[in-house]
Amino acid sequence: MDAMKYHDLRDFLTLLEQQGELKRITLPVDPHLEITEIADRTLRAGGPALLFESPKGYAMPVLCNLFGTPKRVAMGMGQDDVSALREVGKLLAFLKEPEPPKGFRDLFDKLPQFKQVLNMPTKRLRGAPCQQKIASGDDVDLTRLPVMTCWPDDAAPLITWGLTVTRGPHKERQNLGIYRQQLIGKNKLIMRWLSHRGGALDFQEWLAARPGERFPVSVALGADPATILGAVTPVPDTLSEYAFAGLLRGTKTEVVKCLSNDLEVPASAEIILEGYIEPGEMAPEGPYGDHTGYYNEVDNFPVFTVTHITQREDAIYHSTYTGRPPDEPAVLGVALNEVFVPILQKQFPEIVDFYLPPEGCSYRLAVVTMKKQYAGHAKRVMMGVWSFLRQFMYTKFVIVCDDDVNARDWNDVIWAITTRMDPARDTVLVENTPIDYLDFASPVSGLGSKMGLDATNKWPGETQREWGRPIVKDPEVTARIDAIWDELAIFK
C-alpha cells in the first residue's frame, strides 16, 4: 500500500489542483444557503472540490466538496483509486486481529504491513502552524468564521467538519470524532454527540470521575485528509486515529499541545478551537436538515465554550453540507464501503461482497452476498453484520443473497428477494435495538427494530419443496451465435 505523499491540507489541495480536481471560485458567494446550492449541484455532477475565495461578508475562504467523489476519498487515504481501498481494509483487518508470521516466507509477505506500523507513533512539536495566530478572551469571535447555513429552515450556522478531540479521565489515548456544532454566540457552540460516540463516552466518564469540573475539548478545522478520514474509518479500538492517519499518509502524524489544555491537535490544521464543556450547561440543538433528507427534531446537547481560537496565517475554513443522498457523507460511505469488506471477510470468510447503498443513507440498509454452506447460515451472517462492527449497529435492514447475485445491482437483488424468499419464513425481526437518534420512523428515540431478509437459495431443513433450478444458456449455442452476430446486423 504505497501512500501518495502530502503533508497537510494545503499540500493536498495543490495535488488536487494539479489533477483538475479543485476549482477556485472568485465570484462573491454567500455562506448562507448559496454555497450549499453550488456545492450540491457540483457534487451531483461528479465535479471538483470547491474553494470559495470570496465568501460574502468574510475574509476567510471556504473549502467545500473536498471528498465529493470516491476518487478524492481514495486520494485522501493515500491511494490512487477506490479499488485500492480494499488494501486499506486488509491492513485494518490485520491490525484488528494481528497474526504472528508462520515462517520466513510469511514474515516476508507481512513485512510491508510491519513497516507501515513504524509510522504509527505521533510526532510531538513544540510549535506548529495551527498556532501562528492566537485569539483569547474577549478576542474570541466565532462569528468571524464563514460558518455555513445549509438549508432554509436550519436553526443557525453549523460547523460540520470539526474534528473534536477529547480524552476520558482514565485514558491515555485521545478520541477523535466528527460531531456537528451549532453556533449560538461569539464563544459558544452546541456539541451534538450521540451517547454511544467516543466524545460523549469520554464526557460521561469525566462527569463520574470529576463531578463539577469543566471537561476540556478542542476542535480542529481543516486537518490533513488522512487525519479527517481516520476519524470516520472503522479503526480498531486499540489503535488511535492519529496512528491510523500516519499509516495512511506514510509519515508520522504531527501534533501539538493546546495552549489551554493538555489535548494534542493536528499541528498543520487550519483552525483550532480550544475550550471546555461546563457540566450541566445544555442548550436545544436544531432543527437541521441532515443526511436523511429531512429536518431532525430539536433535542438538548452540551454547550462548548471556546476560550481560544488559534489558526494558520491565511487560514481556510473547511465545510460541507448534509442532505438527501447524494451528499458528501454518502460519497464517503461509498468509498469506505471498500474498507469494510476485508474487515468483515476476516471474521466471516464466507462473505463475498458487502454493500451499503448510498440511497439507504449509507448505513441503514446493507446487502451481503455469501457462499452459503448450511441451513440457517444466512441468519448467522445477518447477526454478525449487526454485532461485529459498531458502525453497523444502526443498520435497519440486512439483505443476504447467494454469491451468484451482484450485491451492487438492484435488479439482481430484487430478483433474489422475489424468487428465493417466503416472507414469513425468511424475514427476521428484532425489536428494541439501538437506532439512530435521527431516525424519526422508530417508535422511541434511539430504540427501534431491525429486519433481516434471507434471499438465499433454501437448503434441506429450510424447505420441504424441490427448489427451482436457474435457467442457464447452452454455451455451444452462445458461441455459435457470437460467431455470426455481426453478420446478422440487427442493430445496423
Curated annotation (Swiss-Prot):
Residues holding prenylated FMN: 178-180, 192-194, 197-198
Q: What is its main location?
A: membrane
Residues reported to bind Mn(2+)? 175, 241
Instruction: Copy out the cofactor comment.
Output: Binds 1 prenylated FMN per subunit.
List cofactor names only. Answer: prenylated FMN; Mn(2+)
Q: Which SUPFAM superfamilies match?
A: FMN-binding split barrel, UbiD C-terminal domain-like
According to UniProt, this protein's pathway is: Cofactor biosynthesis; ubiquinone biosynthesis
* BP-aspect Gene Ontology terms: ubiquinone biosynthetic process
Identify its membrane topology class: Peripheral membrane protein
Q: Which GO terms describe its cellular component?
A: cytosol; plasma membrane
Subunit info?
A: Homohexamer.
**UniProt name for this protein:** 3-octaprenyl-4-hydroxybenzoate carboxy-lyase
Lineage of origin: Bacteria, Pseudomonadati, Pseudomonadota, Gammaproteobacteria, Enterobacterales
Originating gene: ubiD
